[in-house]
Amino acid sequence: MTTSGNSINKPDHSAHTPMMQQYLRIKTQHTDKLLFYRMGDFYELFYEDAEKAARLLDITLTHRGSSAGEPIKMAGVPFHAADQYLAKLVKLGESIAICEQIGDPATSKGPVERQVVRIITPGTLTDAGLLEERGNSIVLTLALHHGVIGLAWLNLAAGDMRVLETSPDNLASELERLHPSEILLPESLALPVILNSFTAPKRLPDWQFDYEHAMQQLTRQFGTRDLNAFGCEELRAAIMAAGALFEYVRLTQHTATDESATQVLGHLQTLRVERPETYLRMDAATRRNLEITLTLRGEEAPTLSSLLDICATSMGSRLLRHWLHHPLRNRITLQQRLDAVSDLIGAKPGILYAGIRERLKHIADIERITSRIALRTARPRDLSGLRDSLTALPEIIKLITTSTAIAIHRFVPAMEPDTTLTQLLVHALQPVPGAVIREGGVIADGYDAELDELRALQKNCGEFLLQLEARERERTGIPTLKVEYNRVHGFYIEVTRIHGEKIPADYRRRQTLKNAERYSIPELQVFENKTLTAREQALAQEKKLYEQLLEQLADFIIPLQEIARSVAELDVLCAFAERADLFGYTKPVFTDDPALDIEAGRHPVVENQIEQYIANDIQLGAVTREGRQMLIITGPNMGGKSTYMRQTALIILLAHCGSFVPAGSARIGPIDQIFTRIGAADDLAGGRSTFMVEMTEAASILRNATAQSLVLVDEIGRGTSTFDGLALAFAIARHLLTQNQSYTLFATHYFELTRLAEEFPQAINVHVTAVEHKRRIVFLHRIEEGSASRSYGLHVAALAGVPDKVIRNAGKILAQLEQEALSKSPQQTLFETIEENAEAAPASAHPVLDYLEQLHPDELTPREALEQLYLIKSMANRIK
């Protein structure tokens, strides 16, 4: 079997030793993988594989003799510790073929027969030791048909296979959303630039993407004549991708025939189609800027996910991450989730969700255990975990059904375990089974009569040995004689050297130690043969029974998947309820009106990082007299502009996940997409400058945003000359107002943009407030109407630790520039400050100026300064 589509010319290995001939023959079938070749208690790697493994795993590279006249480079890892090395290789994007000894060394002529029994790739992980407990491993295939990109992806550990079709322009957004661990492409397809940021994609032969071949593969797996029932009959590119994906998975799971694939991949029961209108769309930049699961620095906390993820099960944690990256637009489903959260909070406040969460902690990862049962790779502890989970479910069900939380009663039917399944596991397994079946101790006593008989023979061993020891002591007169056992030498009689003259003639020496001799006698040898045979037979019988048990459990895959889904969703909703209860979140209201009305909104993550958070309102659309469409936000750096913008997006995101939101109230109209253009950095891998990245993101917004989109734009036009940047910012804002007509929050330091409010009544100027007290700036973090008068740029620089000398010099330069600006009237600027010793430009008499001359700012408190600011604003309005 090989997953590579390249034809391989069979090389001549006759000059090599028989063992190396065997190795090279197997290796030629898996040239694109590291071959873990089992030799005794080690997995060995040879030649180039050894060099690569030594480098990646930091293990020793050695030589073992020679073959065909060349030294054999080799490196190895212990069999019992292989998982930790495999996990490291998989994280580095490597694929591994596991080659085991399947022959009996005692009867083999020449090298022991070996065979690849398992292939591990980054996207097809199912072993608990290789998977991230709260993360997913996804393999994705990409096909192109008539300019349409078809995507198919599979979470093998969950049995979840999905497809969609999209445009090439949207590929980056989809990959950012799905974050695949492994990407597969046709050999003939040119590599899209976006894939440069992912682990090197693997190439598959073009024939695997053939449409007819794909249809044949998929209909056989799902037992249907066509794919109409899945709603994807028209998605030709997606079907091509799905067919190639299934072929790849079939081969990696070592199911060589279609029949065995259908049997072993039995947990792949359906093909789900994702359509653009299903989810609230977010492009790659938006997902990064909102810090949903990773901060901008690439850390896991503090993020929205880290705040909300108090899930009791790993299934719940994975589902939460999925919901956060796949916010729904289906309001019926969202209302069901919101009602469930409301009932969980309202039913005996705090008691119900806490009680459910406490019991959920005893539920194992049923989702992944079910997949391993289907793949026949489930280990004994998987099955005991499933057994314990099924026996714990009735208590959770009772807690739900006896509560007043009607909205969560819908989970009960799917969560009720099949009593036949539970009884089978209880009857078949030891209370605490052994870790691996090859060592026994897994199947319970009383489950199989033949196994019980073989075990009884072994248990009587101890009694026989005690009797033999007593008898031999009496016969030989040696009081310290011992009858013992070890794995190397089997059963033996041990006698210290001082009693050497008492050794009977029928004692046969087996081993000499420093202070003792070990012997055997015919009676002990007969018993040893009988006992060891019984042990081998018991292990073989136990292995057979375990395989039969897995076959029986495979019949329960569908109900187990339903249980897993219900438990995971209940877990997430309980987490939502706890967070909402603790942090004072409120239930959002969805409306059909084109409006966004949030009172006392807060940033869910930031408010938990600081002592006091200032809440702010936002009204856009039909709830306002002007039909507000755009807020032009001005004000100082560090004043809270970006936080205000992000909190608006996060509140909408949470609502579309079915969570309560950090606000006094929230009314949300139809939203189809969220776009952000916040911050930027060089894209060195893609060869793009900061400004190019910024403009690319802006272009995506202008092309795709609709009247139902939320657009966040922060500091557009930086990275180029002042006038170029201003012109672009002005044109982009105007386009958003007149063409896209999206809900827009537009933060800027270009004061000229505030003139848009004079031209368009749907554009409103707002600013973040700050006051200066005793030469220091105080950020009030409150959003108020009107444009800002100052940016306090030099104050922020001082707060950042810029030396005083530099700040003073900057003040003088700024004062000079401003004086020149009065005569030349170039671009206005928000970056205004007054240097104490700088000579001010002459000004004509004005009541506001007269009033300002009477004020002494250093004597005012921040509150008094704010009051004076409002008074001056009022005076200016009256004079107009």
Swiss-Prot record:
A Pfam family this chain is assigned to: MutS_IV
Job of this protein: This protein is involved in the repair of mismatches in DNA. It is possible that it carries out the mismatch recognition step. This protein has a weak ATPase activity.
Stated family: Belongs to the DNA mismatch repair MutS family.
Residues that bind ATP: G635, P636, N637, M638, G639, G640, K641, S642
NCBIfam families per the UniProt record, alphabetical: mutS1, PRK05399.1
Source organism (scientific name): Nitrosomonas eutropha (strain DSM 101675 / C91 / Nm57)
Entries under InterPro entries matching the protein: DNA_mismatch_repair_MutS, DNA_mismatch_repair_MutS-lik_N, DNA_mismatch_repair_MutS/MSH, DNA_mismatch_repair_MutS_C, DNA_mismatch_repair_MutS_clamp, DNA_mismatch_repair_MutS_core, DNA_mismatch_repair_MutS_N, DNA_mismatch_repair_MutS_sf
Gene Ontology MF: a single term: damaged DNA binding
GO BP annotations listed: mismatch repair
Gene: mutS
HAMAP family, alphabetized: MutS
Name of the protein described by the UniProt record: DNA mismatch repair protein MutS
Gene Ontology cellular component list: cytosol
Keywords: ATP-binding, DNA damage, DNA repair, DNA-binding, Nucleotide-binding
